[in-house]
Amino acid sequence: MAEIILNVEIRDRAGTGGSRETRRQGKVPGVLYGGPLAPVNIAVKGNEFRKALHTGKLLGHLVTLQHGDEKQSVIAKAVQFHPVTDEPLHFDLYRVDEHQLIKIEIPVHFKNHDISVGLKKGGTLEIIRHTVELACPADKIPEELVIDLASHDIGDTIRISEIKLPEGVRPAMERDFVIANLKASAASQSTEGDTTAEA
């Protein structure tokens, strides 16, 4: 079951005018789409939506949508923010079954920078992908993919095959793509050159 429950109401007016009217009422307008049903214009109370956002478990996660006695599992696909105030302006929700296989972008997190063999030698981490698209059941979406840099040395290439994924979760692409490289910096190359010359 999803951790977040959003209480929604149906919006009568669509389009820009309808969205503005919804925001004037202190609510955030959105659209529910996906599956065999037609898109539905919805709204959530502003304080409730902001509270859900601040948990960090709204966007890209399984959410329970509640309208009266009806409940629906959805994925929060996108949120638009005001460029100045950073207030949420609009959101998109996608209908899913809890066990439905979906494709979704998951953030990559690198840990143990301070004890990384390669970084301690002066190497640099070149990140190729900050997110990875995974295929997984809607109720098993990982929070993030964690890569441990502790044992990685200069010259190492970190590929998706090195990451232990949860059961039932796999990369959306079949090829063994690169996520990051540990490269020699100019300073580390210079140090190695000086050492070689002295020897």
Curated annotation (Swiss-Prot):
Pfam families in the record: Ribosomal_L25p, Ribosomal_TL5_C
InterPro entries hit by this protein: Rbsml_bL25/Gln-tRNA_synth_N (IPR020056), Ribosomal_bL25/Gln-tRNA_synth (IPR011035), Ribosomal_bL25_b-dom (IPR020057), Ribosomal_bL25_C (IPR037121), Ribosomal_bL25_long (IPR001021), Ribosomal_L25_dom (IPR029751), Ribosomal_uL5_bac-type (IPR020930)
Domain of life from the UniProt record: Bacteria
Alphabetical GO biological process terms: translation
One Gene Ontology molecular-function label: structural constituent of ribosome
GO CC terms in record: cytosolic large ribosomal subunit
Alphabetical UniProt keywords: Ribonucleoprotein, Ribosomal protein, RNA-binding, rRNA-binding
Role this protein plays: This is one of the proteins that binds to the 5S RNA in the ribosome where it forms part of the central protuberance.
Entry-linked NCBIfam families: bL25_bact_ctc, PRK05618.1-2
Family designation: Belongs to the bacterial ribosomal protein bL25 family. CTC subfamily.
Stored HAMAP family: Ribosomal_bL25_CTC
Subunit organization: Part of the 50S ribosomal subunit; part of the 5S rRNA/L5/L18/L25 subcomplex. Contacts the 5S rRNA. Binds to the 5S rRNA independently of L5 and L18.
Protein name: Large ribosomal subunit protein bL25
Upper lineage: Bacteria, Pseudomonadati, Pseudomonadota, Alphaproteobacteria, Caulobacterales
Gene: rplY
